[in-house]
Regions:
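ATP-binding/catalytic-site motifs of ATP-hydrolyzing domains
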Residues: 8-10, 14, 161
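Conserved catalytic loops of ABC-family nucleotide-binding domains
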Residues: 130-140, 148
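ABC-fold ATPase nucleotide-binding domain signature/coupling loops
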Residues: 10, 67-95, 106, 117, ...
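Hydrophobic anchor residue at the start of the ABC signature
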Residues: 97, 125, 141
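ABC ATPase nucleotide-binding domain helical subdomain, centered on the C-loop/LSGGQ "ABC signature"
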Residues: 10, 18, 25, 43-83, ...
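C-terminal portion of ABC ATPase nucleotide-binding domains
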Residues: 64, 71-73, 127, 144, ...
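A short, proline-enriched helix->beta-strand linker immediately N-terminal to the Walker B motif
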Residues: 102-106, 135
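Catalytic Walker B motif of ABC-type/P-loop ATPase nucleotide-binding domains
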Residues: 108-112
């Protein structure tokens, strides 16, 4: 997390600049556009603190539909080197989602997490998020607007400032009278 140059961020009413970074990081999971991996085994990457049993790890990988692939491609199952799997970008994102499932936090940040995946992988990710992260706060940074329609609230930024806040469906119903409606129309492909 970066230090703020202005303003403040409150989580549950607490100014995070007054809290130890370790405490903040332990309560936030993030999945970025590129995902984060270390050299080592599948297990090292999904459970870096080595606190989960094999069944829990396999369950998380099954939920994101990667367990079979890891069993097929990995020479030693969870002990296989992560690099020998040659995961696609979408599979890497699903793996990161399995890691978040295995290590739940109060807040899940998705920073362009679906921007480099195909439509099928995006659908899997959205389904897993809907079914498994309902009790968490989810903050999604996205240009693929379809991925945020299930959210309770969207915040539209313009030039680094909040331009609009609201329910995505209510904002879309107002059409181009809203920033979100205009953005939606602008980003939709032309009809043939």
């Amino acid at each position: 997390m970066l230090d703020l140059s202005a303003g403040q961020i409150l989580i549950d009413g607490l100014d995070i600049s007054q809290l130890p970074r370790h405490d903040i990081r332990s309560r936030i999971n993030s999945i970025t556009q590129d995902g984060v991996f270390i050299q080592g085994s599948v297990r090292d990457n999904i459970d870096p603190r080595n606190v989960h049993n094999v069944d829990a790890i396999c369950d998380a990988l099954e939920v994101v539909q990667l367990l079979e692939l890891i069993e097929e491609k990995g020479s030693n199952g969870l002990s296989s080197d992560i690099s020998e799997l040659h995961l696609s970008q979408g599979q890497k994102q699903l793996f990161c989602l399995a890691r978040a499932l295995l290590n739940p936090s109060q807040i899940l940040v998705l920073d362009e997490a679906t921007s480099t995946v195909d439509e099928h992988t995006d659908e899997i990710m959205q389904k897993v998020i809907r079914q498994n992260f309902g009790s968490q706060t989810i903050i999604t940074v996205a240009h693929r607007l379809e991925s945020i329609l299930d959210h309770d609230t969207v915040v539209v930024l313009d030039g680094g400032r909040i331009a609009e806040i609201g329910d995505p469906h209510e904002l879309l119903a107002q059409g181009e009278d809203t920033e979100f409606g205009r953005l939606w129309k602008f980003l939709q492909p032309e009809s043939s």
